[in-house]
Amino acid sequence: MNKQPEEWQDPQSLQQQDDEQDEIIWVSKSEIKRDAETLKQLGVELVSLGKNALEKIPLDDDLRCAIALAQRIKREGQRRQIQLIGKMLRARDPEPIQQALDKLKNRHNQQITLFHKLEILRDKLLAQGDDAIAQVLEHYPQADRQQLRALVRNAQKEKAAKKPPKTARQLYQYLHTLSEAD
């Protein structure tokens, strides 16, 4: 069959041929392997989660069962099961799963940051006394001044007497309830 020179063909057929050539996207084997490894790591993270955390992630029943099985088995069987989970994730859209997992991690990091801030605030209350109480009352106007002063005073007495920090823990819990109410 003789092929016609390009100048003899109509412009629309040339445009269609160019579009078909543009649609072909070559993906290297290394990139495919990297993507597969990323999805396998996502599977490892899913297997390491607890039951309550897994309920918050949008998974279908097959994937949920595969993850539950991977959590029950050990060593080589678990490795193979994680590879299967990675393969199952390749057939699905992993983006919503990754977003839910990131949201869970972020919430955990926010809680840790809050705990550290409250511990610093408690230590500041024990060190500075009334000045720090005034700052806490500005930040948390719903706080009970008398209860806060009593907790600080008792925690300072315990610290001076080298007793276990029972009241300091109560002060921390009180600050935690204030931050939750805020």
Swiss-Prot record:
Which keywords are on file for this protein?
A: Cytoplasm, Ribosome biogenesis, RNA-binding, rRNA-binding
UniProt subcellular location:
Cytoplasm
Q: Which InterPro entries match?
A: DarP (IPR006839), DarP_sf (IPR023153)
Q: Could you tell me which Gene3D superfamilies the record lists for this protein? A: PSPTO4464-like domains (1.10.60.30)
GO MF terms listed in the record are: ribosome binding; rRNA binding
The coiled-coil regions, if any, are: none
Question: Looking at the UniProt record for this protein, which Gene Ontology cellular component terms does it annotate, in alphabetical order?
Answer: cytosol
Q: For this UniProt entry, what is the primary localization, expressed as one broad class?
A: cytoplasm
Which cysteines does the record link by disulfide bonds? none
The organism's place on the tree of life at top rank: Bacteria
Recorded hits in SUPFAM superfamilies, A to Z, give:
PSPTO4464-like
Indicate whether RNA-binding appears among the record's keywords: yes
Q: Where is this region: Disordered?
A: 1-20
Q: Which family does the record assign?
A: Belongs to the DarP family.
What the protein does?
Member of a network of 50S ribosomal subunit biogenesis factors which assembles along the 30S-50S interface, preventing incorrect 23S rRNA structures from forming. Promotes peptidyl transferase center (PTC) maturation.
Task: Write down what this protein is called.
Answer: Dual-action ribosomal maturation protein DarP
UniProt lists the gene as: darP
